[in-house]
């Protein structure tokens, strides 16, 4: 069966593999603090239907409690080790909604139906708030079933990235973010293309761009909001020409036939 990836916007996507639905970093709101959703309709209620949800790190645009509250009771949450201690609201929400929580460190593996989900390191600030002390390691995940799908979460390039991830068929890489000034711990289109060349998957899906933008910034610097997806496609063609890049619109899907 083909593996299907649907991008809902930002870092939120559904990976369907081996009859299991894995939802990444769900964010289902029109506004979050100073950010406003500028492109793409809000995901439909069906986007919250999942067998397991993976959360890459504690930042509120990735671990978003009101969006997690839309999950059906019994939906399994996979979060970085220490997340419940760092975010007490997560512990309360999981108890009230009946969401089983599994905390993982880099290298940990869990089974989800016919899938194996392995946590891998990410080079990103793991704190909940920029100046806080509550923290947990930022992670990526490799979802292995008919294919091996790498969801990078939010990360910069780091030594040993390809070794930590291992062989993968699809790489879901962040290429933009929500602001124009992305430094350490992030991938811009150029660095994402470098990561793609190192990872050498069969296919790639750019994520984490062109959805949320600081209020007012879409009028001041619109090119920085729209450009990352197309820029990544161009740079990937130069650095990783053997990789099929799928630049999805919000709510669009790609399919990858299982490797023979």
Give names to the regions the model predicted.
Residues 14-58, 62-70, 79-82, 126-131, ...:
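Pre-active-site segment of Zn-dependent metallo-hydrolases
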Residues 64-74, 88-93, 215-228:
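Metal-dependent catalytic neighborhoods of phosphoester/phosphodiester hydrolases
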Residues 20-22, 51-52, 76, 115, ...:
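Structural motif
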Residues 30-31, 118-146, 155-160, 170-172:
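Active-site-proximal loop/helix segment associated with metal-binding centers of metalloenzymes
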Residues 85, 158-250:
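Cap/insert and terminal regions of metallo-dependent hydrolase folds
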Residues 26-28, 58, 82, 120-124, ...:
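Active-site metal-binding loops of divalent metal-dependent hydrolases
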Residues 20, 73-76, 99, 199-203, ...:
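A short helix->loop->beta-strand "cap" motif at the edges of active sites that frequently abuts
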Residues 1-4, 16-22, 109-118, 144-149, ...:
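Beta-strand-turn-beta hairpins that frame and shape the catalytic cleft
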């Amino acid at each position: 069966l083909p593996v299907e990836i649907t991008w809902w916007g930002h870092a939120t996507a559904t990976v369907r593999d081996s009859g299991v639905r894995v939802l990444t970093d769900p964010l289902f709101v029109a506004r979050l603090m100073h950010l406003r959703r500028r492109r793409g309709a809000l995901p439909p209620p069906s986007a919250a239907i999942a067998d397991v949800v993976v959360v890459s790190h504690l930042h509120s645009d990735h671990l978003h409690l009101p969006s997690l509250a839309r999950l059906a009771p019994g939906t399994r949450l996979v979060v970085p080790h220490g997340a419940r201690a760092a975010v007490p609201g997560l512990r309360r929400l999981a108890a009230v909604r009946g969401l089983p929580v599994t905390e993982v460190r880099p290298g940990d593996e869990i089974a989800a139906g016919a899938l194996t989900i392995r946590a891998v390191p990410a080079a990103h600030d793991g704190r909940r708030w920029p100046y806080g002390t509550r923290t947990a390691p930022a992670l990526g995940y490799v979802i292995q079933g008919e294919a091996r799908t790498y969801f990078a979460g939010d990360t910069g390039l780091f030594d040993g990235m390809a070794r930590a991830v291992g062989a993968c068929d699809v790489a879901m890489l962040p290429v933009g973010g929500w602001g124009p000034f992305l430094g350490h711990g992030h991938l811009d289109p150029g660095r994402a293309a470098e990561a793609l060349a190192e990872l050498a998957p069969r296919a790639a899906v750019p994520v984490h761009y062109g959805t949320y933008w600081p209020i007012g910034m879409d009028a001041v610097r619109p090119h920085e909001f729209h450009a990352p997806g197309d820029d990544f496609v161009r740079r990937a063609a130069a650095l990783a020409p053997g990789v099929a890049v799928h630049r999805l619109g919000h709510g669009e899907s790609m399919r990858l036939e299982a490797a023979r």
